[in-house]
Amino acid sequence: MSHIEKQAGELQEKLIAVNRVSKTVKGGRIFSFTALTVVGDGNGRVGFGYGKAREVPAAIQKAMEKARRAMINVALDNGTLQHPVKGAHTGSRVFMQPASEGTGIIAGGAMRAVLEVAGVHNVLAKAYGSTNPINVVRATIAALEDMKSPEMVAAKRGKSVEEILGK
């Protein structure tokens, strides 16, 4: 996986969830915050980050920084997916399939944010099992990472793209 430095202005950033958590100590509770964010260039690059801090802005900033560092490339096909894909992380399972032009992003919550910043414009998606945002985001990114273009499959098998597509 190659890491390409991008200017912050070129990336779309989305905040998915902010959560207040507490640690109980002898003197009472210590509150801190967690933030889940996704960033993408709208053209097949996407990453997510999870930041924790005592203040909300600091948690968001940490999450954005981690997301920028952990970006992956997604092989898109004219604004949709190459083929139907499944992904899972702990109790969350996701299923995504390509859709025709004009369908839009039919996906819920955390999945929608990931697909929007990745540059997917037409997709049908469903999350099963746990809808915990962190696990849904991890499952979605795992599914997108597993997706292969016909060119990638052809290169791996040592065949032509026509042979792979059956033309």
From Swiss-Prot:
Q: Which UniProt keywords apply?
A: Ribonucleoprotein, Ribosomal protein, RNA-binding, rRNA-binding
One Gene Ontology biological process: translation
Q: Which GO terms describe its molecular function?
A: rRNA binding; structural constituent of ribosome
What region holds the S5 DRBM domain? 11-74
A single GO cellular-component term from the record reads: small ribosomal subunit
Residue ranges the record marks as coiled coil: none
Asked whether the keyword Metal-binding is assigned, the reply is no
**Gene3D superfamilies, per this entry?**
3.30.160.20, 3.30.230.10
Q: What does this protein do?
A: With S4 and S12 plays an important role in translational accuracy.
| The record's note on its domains | The N-terminal domain interacts with the head of the 30S subunit; the C-terminal domain interacts with the body and contacts protein S4. The interaction surface between S4 and S5 is involved in control of translational fidelity.
Task: Outline the subunit composition.
Answer: Part of the 30S ribosomal subunit. Contacts proteins S4 and S8.
Task: Describe the family membership recorded for this protein in Swiss-Prot or TrEMBL.
Answer: Belongs to the universal ribosomal protein uS5 family.
> Know the name of this protein?
Small ribosomal subunit protein uS5
Name its species: Yersinia enterocolitica serotype O:8 / biotype 1B (strain NCTC 13174 / 8081)
**Lineage of producing organism:** Bacteria, Pseudomonadati, Pseudomonadota, Gammaproteobacteria, Enterobacterales
Q: Which gene encodes it?
A: rpsE
